[in-house]
């Protein structure tokens, strides 16, 4: 239902946020920015 949809949206947002944080961290570490 609506709650499941909201849960999925939140999970996807958290995933993409986590991915971008990881990407910026690894780029800083390897100095490829």
UniProtKB/Swiss-Prot annotation:
Biological process annotations from GO: defense response to fungus; defense response to Gram-negative bacterium; defense response to Gram-positive bacterium; hemolysis in another organism
UniProt note on tissues of expression: Expressed by the skin glands.
Kindly list the cysteine pairs connected by disulfide bridges. Answer: 27-33
**GO annotation, cellular component aspect:** extracellular region
Show the Pfam families listed in the entry.
Antimicrobial_2
Q: Does the keyword Secreted apply?
A: yes
User: Where is it located?
Assistant: Secreted
Q: Which UniProt keywords apply?
A: Amphibian defense peptide, Antibiotic, Antimicrobial, Cytolysis, Disulfide bond, Fungicide, Hemolysis, Secreted
In its keyword annotation, does this UniProt entry include Iron? Answer: no
Domain of life of the organism encoding this protein? Eukaryota
Instruction: Name the principal localization, coarsely classed.
Output: secreted
Protein family membership: Belongs to the frog skin active peptide (FSAP) family. Brevinin subfamily.
Q: What is this protein's function per UniProt?
A: Has antibacterial activity against E.coli ATCC 25992 (MIC=38 uM), E.coli CIB 84492 (MIC=38 uM), S.aureus ATCC 25923 (MIC=19 uM) and S.aureus CIB 85462 (MIC=19 uM). Has antifungal activity against C.albicans (MIC=19 uM). Has weak hemolytic activity against rabbit erythrocytes.
Protein name per the record:
Brevinin-2JD
Source organism = Odorrana jingdongensis
Q: What is the lineage of its organism?
A: Eukaryota, Metazoa, Chordata, Craniata, Vertebrata
